[in-house]
Amino acid sequence: MIPLIGQLYRNNNVVTSIHGRGLINRSVIAIMKAHRFARHRMADDAELSVHETFPILKAMSELKLGAASVDLGKMVAKFKAEGNGRSIEDFVKAELAEVAGKQNGDAREGTDVVLYGFGRIGRLLARILIEKTGGGDGLRLRAIVVRKGAENDLVKRASLLRRDSVHGPFDGTITIDEENNTLTANGNLIQVIYSNDPASIDYTQYGIKNALLVDNTGKWRDAEGLGQHLKCPGIDRVVLTAPGKGALKNIVHGINHTDIGADDKIISAASCTTNAIVPVLKAVNDQYGIVNGHVETVHSYTNDQNLIDNFHKGSRRGRSAPLNMVITKTGAATAAAKALPVLKGKLTGNAIRVPTPNVSMAILNLNLEKATTREEINEYLRQMAMHSDLQKQIDFVSSQEVVSTDFVGSRHAGVVDAEATICNDNRVVLYVWYDNEFGYSCQVVRVMEDMAGVNPPAFPR
């Protein structure tokens, strides 16, 4: 399977997955685990076999496909339900007719990407973008902008990309060219630009044009501040990886990404917590109606806090992060209404920072218009994770043994913990895990792909 998966990706820009679990650059063991995971997504809890997915993959390889995203697990399920005696080859050809024979038929230049800032989110975005390079007609990481911190700054930046205490080693190779201030990661040449002024850089001198710039610094959060980037030659659009202020659109992919217009030059990808809770809130509101509720986030500490007690402009934030639980504020409840206006005025929110470096939890305490049961709402959310437009945002787990570190590297915006669900008629309490670093970064990339118009069609329909 691995050679076919790789060939389809490199030659056809076809991304394969099994019920949302990506197969690109995965080991044999990881692919087998993805097949076994599928039992949580099958109606009869049956395990998915490579003997079922491989024939579909082989048939795909013979169709000269154009760019597409194909879920092999769902293809198997649809073939079982709607095959009607057809051969695998005929079924796959009919299902993928829209892109069959279109290899290189929609040749695009791709979209240049500049990361302005290279902290926790910036480095994870870099990893994801490098991983998704494919044939080069999607998002292409071209440059990173930072302030120079030391004489050996480039070496240190490369080391931080190569090694991560939470997310593990970089999957590939990184070489350094100090003379030209470039990094080469898995064959991708990345220019490192040193600057303290966002409006002073001419990106075109590095061959960058019509680029999408991602501001990871959080220093500017309104249109005026972020508009400085648009004054630079080579920059066409800007995405902020923090809640936006003023009239900026706060986009949560899967919820309101269709609001992104061709004229939108600056948008916000909201916060990690907003991305985690809004998809689940929308699912619940659509089915049961939300009267009101409270959102409590149990959030890992961040770089904004102190290792030991020291001054901080925020209340309690100056106290030692590794030693304390810290009650603080969150704007997620208010921000949720920006992405989902039907929730305006219905939610309150608060946060507790805890001594863990990554993975957080949102506790949604909701009063519903329609009464339900624990079993019913869990099954509904399970179905939403499997067969809805929110399947990339909502994941679902039903185990009494999972803990926070089990969700490091989750690519979903949030994961509903079914075993923790509490329900009493019209009142429900839902527990949603989320990787506040990597899961959020995946959401940011989805917003970037929509803004750049490089999202391939997804199959099966």
From Swiss-Prot:
Positions of post-translational Phosphothreonine modification: T421
Alphabetical list of Gene3D superfamilies matching this protein: Dihydrodipicolinate Reductase, domain 2, NAD(P)-binding Rossmann-like Domain
Keywords for this protein: NAD, Oxidoreductase, Phosphoprotein
GO MF terms, alphabetically ordered: NAD binding; NADP binding; oxidoreductase activity, acting on the aldehyde or oxo group of donors, NAD or NADP as acceptor
Enzyme nomenclature, EC number: 1.2.1.-
GO biological process, one term: glucose metabolic process
Keyword Oxidoreductase listed: yes
Family designation: Belongs to the glyceraldehyde-3-phosphate dehydrogenase family.
Protein name (database record): Glyceraldehyde-3-phosphate dehydrogenase-like protein
Gene name linked to the record: gap2
